[in-house]
C-alpha cells in the first residue's frame, strides 16, 4: 500500500484589519499515512470577530494553491466536500480538516487560513 505524505509547514499567519490581529496556527509539521487511511489536520485561531470565514488550502508538488474546503463562522453545520470534512468548534477557536480514504493525490502542503 502506498504512503501518502501530508507535509505541512508550521504556519503562523496574521491578518491585520481595522487595528485587530487574527492569528492562525497549525501545530503539526508533517504527517505520513497509508493510502486509504483517515487523517485529521488541526488548526487553531484567535479572533474577536463574530463573522468570518475559515479555509483549508493544499499546495501539491505542482506548487499551485487549491481550495479544499471553507467554513462560514455563522453556520452551525460543519462543511463537507467529498472526502474532506471539517470539525469547526467556534467557542474553542478550533478548525480541523479530516481527509477520509486518503489517496496519493492528497500529497501536499496544507494551509489553514482566516478571512474577515
From Swiss-Prot:
Q: What is the disulfide pattern of this chain?
A: 43-112
* Top-level taxon in the UniProt lineage: Eukaryota
Q: What Gene Ontology terms for biological process does this UniProt record contain? A: adaptive immune response; immune response
Cleaved signal peptide residues: 1-21
- Cellular compartment(s): Cell membrane
User: Which InterPro entries does the entry mention?
Assistant: Ig-like_dom, Ig-like_dom_sf, Ig-like_fold, Ig_V-set, TCR_variable_region
Q: Which keywords does this Swiss-Prot/TrEMBL entry list?
A: Adaptive immunity, Cell membrane, Disulfide bond, Glycoprotein, Immunity, Immunoglobulin domain, Membrane, Receptor, Signal, T cell receptor
The Ig-like domain is annotated at: 22-116
Residues bearing carbohydrate: 78
Gene3D superfamilies associated with the record: Immunoglobulins
Question: Quaternary form?
Answer: Alpha-beta TR is a heterodimer composed of an alpha and beta chain; disulfide-linked. The alpha-beta TR is associated with the transmembrane signaling CD3 coreceptor proteins to form the TR-CD3 (TcR or TCR). The assembly of alpha-beta TR heterodimers with CD3 occurs in the endoplasmic reticulum where a single alpha-beta TR heterodimer associates with one CD3D-CD3E heterodimer, one CD3G-CD3E heterodimer and one CD247 homodimer forming a stable octameric structure. CD3D-CD3E and CD3G-CD3E heterodimers preferentially associate with TR alpha and TR beta chains, respectively.
Q: What is this protein called?
A: T cell receptor alpha variable 38-1
> The organism's lineage?
Eukaryota, Metazoa, Chordata, Craniata, Vertebrata
Task: Write the gene name.
Answer: TRAV38-1
Amino acid at each position: 500500500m502506498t504512503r501518502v505524505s501530508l507535509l505541512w509547514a508550521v504556519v503562523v499567519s496574521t491578518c491585520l484589519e481595522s487595528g485587530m490581529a487574527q492569528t492562525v496556527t497549525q501545530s503539526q509539521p508533517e504527517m505520513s499515512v497509508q493510502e486509504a487511511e483517515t487523517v485529521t489536520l488541526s488548526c487553531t485561531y484567535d479572533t474577536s470577530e463574530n463573522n468570518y470565514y475559515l479555509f483549508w488550502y493544499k499546495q501539491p508538488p505542482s506548487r499551485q494553491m487549491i481550495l479544499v474546503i471553507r467554513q462560514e463562522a455563522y453556520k452551525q453545520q460543519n462543511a463537507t466536500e467529498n472526502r474532506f470534512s471539517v470539525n469547526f468548534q467556534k467557542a474553542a477557536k478550533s478548525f480541523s480538516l479530516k481527509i477520509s480514504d486518503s489517496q496519493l493525490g492528497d500529497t501536499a502542503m496544507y494551509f489553514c487560513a482566516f478571512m474577515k
